[in-house]
Amino acid sequence: MQVLSEQEVERRKDREELMKLGINPYPAEAFPINVTSEDIHRNYENRKLDYKDIKIAGRLMSRRIMGSASFGEIQDASGRLQFYIRRDDICPSEDKTLYNTVFKKLLGIGDFLGLKGYIFTTQTGEISLHVTEMTLLSKSVKPLPTVKRDDEGNVYDGFTDPEMRYRQRYVDLTVNPEVKNTFVTRSKIISQMRRYFDDNGWLEVETPILQAVHGGAAARPFGTHHNTLDMPLFLRIANELYLKRLIVGGFDGVYEFGKMFRNEGMDRTHNPEFTSMEIYVAYKDYIWMMEMVEELIEQVTEKIHGKTEIPVGDKMINFAGPYRRLTMYDSIKEYAGIDVSELDESGLREACQKLAIAVDETMGRGRLVDEIFGAKVEANLIQPTYITDYPIEMTPLAKKHRTSPGLVERFELFVNGKEIANAYTELNDPIDQRERFEEQLKLAARGDDEAMAMDDDFLRALEYGMPPSSGLGIGIDRLTMLLTNKTTIQEVLFFPQMRPEKKQVDLSEEEKMIFELLKLESPVALADLKVKVELSGKKWDVAMKGLTGKGVTKEIKEGDAITVSLVD
């Protein structure tokens, strides 16, 4: 049964009262708006005659009742607008119910209103709407958090708890307008990138999200099962291999913005569902791709911010090209002080041990090099930097380096210590590609759960011939973090993945006593806990059974000893 707060109970009563007055709290009719608050604030002073008959809709966000007249604020998708409402204007007849009862008593903060009237300037110079007609469009039965701002813009009692904000993004967007700006910027970033690609004549495409073979990246997939076909399928970890099939099919350039899924950990820069852009262009190599990426990101930054140097945390990042280029081996030599270029797997394990880097037996040479790089190099790459020329074991889909044996033509772009982009000169030799896949199968047999699977259909496509090509992947979420100066990926995702929400549990007085003791020490010996609680045998048994049944505590038996702990 739903437990309602006092305000929620009152709002439901207000809803019933509105219906008794013949007012539908949720009317079906459209309300044809003809202006936004942003338009009014931007253009009113120069186009006053255009705002004599306007219709605007949005949430009621504040209200100051002063007898037969009141001021308030309405918030639409673009911002807020003050309005002035008089009883006799919206109630020209003798019946003053709409103002005296509906507006003053039955409306609440968060209700959606449709207002009609004209714009004027108050004596204090504030652009405002003089309301002549008011329509209730939707009644809110749950109160919004109260966010108070002083004259200097300081926020008090704000809706600021990160977990609540991410779970209830709909509330976050309503009461924290700067959050909406982040997502508007995200949309603009994607639009600018798409425009750049289209201007170059490359085709936007769509490829399968459900795939029979999880390929194109080193990551753990999410698996599912197709009942009709009776076969396992995977949510894609990358779209690379399908895009390359289209290059085989004759397209000179294809790109895709899409969701990828990786069944891995969550942290400040990782979400199991994320957005990536991948592009493949025929007759190009990774050197050309570096120049293209510089031009792309420089243009996007300029369009979004009007400049190429922007703050990221406490640093200033300059996205104007050209970017620094450093080979992977040289970067490890510079920041870790060791030359790994000639080390075999055994030597790399010794190096990891000396550097206090944890590794396991499933890791081959490429993974070991990558572990050293991640631990000792990444955090130092603040300004945009290309790390190039990776060990062949790390990248089974990239072409062998044209001059350096044992390496492949690959680069990753790092900014502020994080990888933003990944690109190759694409491997188009089907024999070499098959051998690389076979090496991946050997790693999988050793227990490497990030090893790639064999994709026979992709190999068949390569056998028909693929032109020399270069491919690129950019993490849209991380790029957005940079260009909006956000420190966590959750801030740039409307609905990030969250752990299951813990439900509030009602506890008896005896259960609360035990719970409070376990908050101080958990786990604890069952016998010791019983002594501390000092409950009678029956009350103790009922309370412990209740806590276990509600999922609050668990008992662990080891031999003759029994301990009690809180459930995480």
Predicted segments, located by residue:
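Hydrophobic residues on short alpha-helical segments
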Residues: 511-518
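Class II aminoacyl-tRNA synthetase catalytic cores and aaRS-like
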Residues: 1-505
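Short amphipathic alpha-helical interaction segments
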Residues: 535-549
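Alpha-helix C-caps/helix-loop-beta hinges
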Residues: 116, 200, 521, 550-551
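Short, cationic-aromatic polyanion-contact patches
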Residues: 504-511, 525, 555-568
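Short acidic, hydrophobic short linear motifs in intrinsically disordered regions
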Residues: 523-533
